[in-house]
């Protein structure tokens, strides 16, 4: 198995539920961090040379300060419950956020152009149903080229796949092959749900396929709740949700 697969708990630190810097991944741009307010009620981060997206996963009424400017994130009870509001964080900003319980994600990208801080309410997040048949899934466009242009490098979206369906289809890549001019690193963070629950559940499993043209990597991983997978290059897909166990994944992408 490649070292691209990061099982749940393997990226935990004293400060983070998940801490995945560009250096940890052996690449240049994408960072992925999650924080649990049950561990600590307030966190402070300085985004030196980075821009970011602050996105509640399973927390509500989060107080946020971005370079002294105050915001409140309404959040959500869990990723399967609803779309959440979020905040774009400028390059070089100092960010503090506090809450009583639950988890929040900070997605980052190495960047140099500075854009203003921006709060986006949940009702303004562009939600689309993509695919058909067993490839039907919901995409929440957080910071994508069609939904948010006031950023430099970062791209963030959420995908919810009903139990028994698949997503990341057809298999695709972002490494400047003919017909695709972009180069993007990509992080997948998964939660495996259970019918009728707002949260991930340790009972279910899903599956994820990744392969490279030179066949140095060709693997299908059995996914458990809160697993992470980094994709520096190569084809990825499908992501398969087992019957009765819907799948959520959060993507962050960035590149030159």
Predicted regions and their residues:
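Charged, cofactor-coupling segments
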Residues: 17, 27, 237, 241-256
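A gly/proline- and charged-residue-enriched helix-loop-helix capping module
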Residues: 77-88, 113-138
């Amino acid at each position: 198995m490649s070292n691209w697969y990061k099982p749940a708990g393997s990226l935990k630190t004293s400060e983070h539920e998940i801490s995945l810097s560009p250096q940890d991944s052996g690449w240049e741009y994408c960072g992925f961090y999650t924080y649990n307010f049950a561990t600590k009620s307030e966190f402070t981060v300085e985004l030196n040379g980075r821009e970011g997206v602050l996105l509640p996963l399973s927390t509500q009424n989060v107080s946020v300060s971005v370079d002294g400017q105050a915001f409140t994130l309404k959040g959500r009870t869990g990723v399967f419950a609803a779309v959440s509001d979020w905040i774009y964080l400028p390059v070089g900003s100092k960010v503090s956020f506090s809450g009583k319980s639950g988890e929040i994600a900070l997605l980052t990208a190495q960047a140099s152009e500075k854009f203003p801080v921006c709060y986006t309410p949940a009702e303004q997040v562009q939600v689309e149903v993509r695919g058909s048949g067993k490839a039907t899934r919901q995409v929440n466009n957080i910071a994508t080229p069609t939904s948010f242009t006031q950023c430099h490098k970062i791209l963030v979206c959420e995908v919810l796949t009903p139990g028994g369906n698949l997503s990341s289809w057809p298999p695709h890549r972002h490494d400047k092959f003919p017909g695709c001019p972009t180069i993007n690193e990509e992080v997948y963070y998964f939660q495996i749900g259970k019918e009728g629950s707002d949260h991930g559940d340790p009972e279910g499993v899903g599956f994820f396929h990744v392969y490279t043209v030179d066949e140095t990597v060709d693997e299908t991983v059995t996914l458990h709740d809160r697993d992470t997978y980094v994709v520096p290059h190569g084809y990825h897909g499908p992501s398969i949700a087992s019957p009765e166990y819907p799948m959520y994944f959060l993507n962050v992408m960035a590149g030159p």
